[in-house]
Amino acid sequence: MRVVRQLNELEEALTLSRSEAKNAFGDDNVLLERFIEGPRHIEFQIFGDQHGNFVHLHERECSIQRRHQKILEESPSPFLDGTLRKQMAEASLKAANAVQYLGAGTVEFIVGEDRSFYFIEMNTRLQVEHPVTEMQTGLDLVEWQIRVASGEKLPLDQDQIRPQGHSIEAVSYTHLTLPTIVGV
């Protein structure tokens, strides 16, 4: 991967990237994408039922990472203001509605320093971080998933889902930095 900040850097970066791709994978095709300065990783928990109802259960921020692994998962995001939070929530519901999504899902975005946001992916399941949302909303998302899978309507409408307080989940990583000692 290479970041190109000036147009005159593009040709050389593309040539090098194609060469590396060819050597590593036998194919010199490359993908160009926008580089986001100071990215924030924000995800919205959503639910859809068989009756055409969709809700979001607010956001989680997981921008603090090490080696692309989440360290902190936090709700609400300290980065989002009310306007951006509303825009992203609406985009999440629009995505769910577009595919008539059923069950629990997570719509993930990257947000730049300029507060522009970009869709990354949708995870079509409850994620391991869902207790952050449960703590902040007071709702049992596993129960919701079972009810929706059984054909029931969503238990609450959007205006009944209110965040309460602040929730943080932390992961502790241990890395052995000394040479491994046999038997230890």
What is the predicted role of each segment?
Residues H175-V184:
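Single conserved hydrophobic/aromatic residue that forms the stacking wall/gate
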